[in-house]
């Protein structure tokens, strides 16, 4: 089950389940679109992968066993352990490699 993390791991802005600006990598690291575009340049600082829009989980259980009531978002806030300098250096070394070749 996709973990819906509650915040951007870089700037700590809230990203509720319905946030259209939430971005995730293949490991579910979660960042806001502004950080992905302006700071991270589509490079996850944790794994080096790229980002995609996070799916929005339906509020309503349209089918049994689905929806936010059945699979609620995480309450655990996460923050990247890397400094701004570490992130900048990492991004600079990875961003020119196509996502499909990382």
Outline where the language-model segments fall.
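Intrinsically disordered, low-complexity regulatory regions in eukaryotic proteins
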Residues: 1-102
